[in-house]
Regions:
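Short alpha-helix boundary/capping motifs
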Residues: 68, 147, 202, 229-230
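A short linear boundary/processing microfeature
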Residues: 17, 80, 99, 163, ...
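Short, solvent-exposed coil/turn elements at secondary-structure transition points
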Residues: 90-92, 150, 172, 226, ...
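Glycine/alanine-rich phosphate-binding loops at beta-alpha junctions
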Residues: 175
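PAPS-dependent sulfotransferases, especially Golgi type II membrane carbohydrate sulfotransferases
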Residues: 1-60, 110-141, 180-222, 230-299
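Phosphate-binding active sites in nucleotide-utilizing proteins
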Residues: 50-161, 169
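PAPS/PAP-binding and catalytic site of the sulfotransferase fold
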Residues: 70-85, 153-165, 169-172, 181, ...
């Protein structure tokens, strides 16, 4: 395994250099500041004052978490239900927040500009998101948006789509981070090509999720990847129940569902559930000190 890990490290070092040369740099201190600004903006008071704003439709389902934490698997399970549609990684939430940022450009940035949103604008943005998913799946009762990084936007999502459901996928931090490190995301996830950067991103993800879980009122279900692998039917029933859908056996045969999957896990979700990816990090343990030390208490 030493040889294969060395090859991964060389590839990641080269990729990081290439990204940095084109100005795509992950700066942990900037990321930490951005997460703190989200928490400061979407305070308990902010959310309380805007209760009942936005569009209350129960159609949107956001599956989010760290990349490579089981988001594609959970989406595929839900998409196997006859009344649900898997839309993949939609950019609509970031499109709406960028539009908000553009509106106040030069005066106030996102997320701080969210405090200027009126009740009518929140309803309008919620409707804009619904229009986008209705176009994709007019008949579906639930539409899954599995953009992992939406975990950063949960305060915004609650403000404009308070009736939506959030499924937060969790996976062992070492496996989750190593799986990112072993994946070439092409032009995204700039934090994933360096073990120290990955650890920094992961720590901030945990900090923000802990905050959302105690502050938000939107419905959130946490799904642990390893538990889903070990108790497939039990956890799948929990997911379908959370979505307020009737049970359907097709959700257990998710790997037979014919649909386009355009993410890094496309091949895995065509196989029945297995334990191959559980504790995979242990094979590479001797070379993961930077990651383990960076994760600290989370490792």
């Amino acid at each position: 395994n030493e040889g294969s890990f060395a090859a991964y490290r060389r590839a990641n070092d080269a990729k990081k250099e290439q990204l940095n040369a084109s100005g795509k740099v992950f700066r942990p201190e900037n990321h930490t500041a951005y997460i703190s600004r989200n928490m400061a903006t979407y305070s308990a008071d902010f959310l309380r004052q805007r209760k009942g704003w936005g569009n209350s439709s129960g159609k949107p389902v956001f599956v989010c978490g760290m990349p490579r934490s089981g988001t594609t698997l959970v989406e595929q399970i839900i998409a196997s239900h006859p009344k649900a549609h898997g839309a993949g990684e939609l950019k609509d939430i970031s499109r709406l927040s960028v539009a908000l940022s553009d509106k106040w450009r030069g005066q106030i940035n996102y997320p701080e500009c969210a405090v200027r949103v009126t009740e009518a604008e929140a309803a309008e943005m919620g409707q804009s998101y619904l229009d986008a998913i209705n176009k994709l799946a007019p008949e579906a009762a639930r539409v899954v948006d599995k953009m992992p990084a939406n975990f950063i936007n949960l305060g915004f999502i609650q403000t404009i789509l308070p009736g939506s459901r959030i499924i937060h996928t969790r996976r062992h931090p070492m496996d989750s981070c190593l799986s990112c490190y072993f994946q070439n995301f092409r032009e995204s996830q700039f934090f994933s090509y360096d073990l120290k950067d990955l650890a920094a991103y992961y720590r901030e993800y945990e900090r923000l999720m802990a905050y959302w879980l105690k502050t938000l009122s939107v419905q959130i279900l946490e799904v642990q990847y390893e538990e889903l692998v070990d108790n497939q039917e039990e956890v799948t029933r929990e997911i379908i129940d959370f979505l307020d859908l009737e049970w359907d056996d097709a959700c257990l045969d998710f790997h037979k569902t014919k649909r386009l999957v355009q993410t890094a896990s496309a091949w895995q979700v065509r196989q029945p559930i297995n334990r191959k990816a559980v504790q995979r990090w242990r094979k590479y343990e001797p070379w993961l000190d930077d990651l383990r030390n960076g994760l600290g208490k989370f490792a």
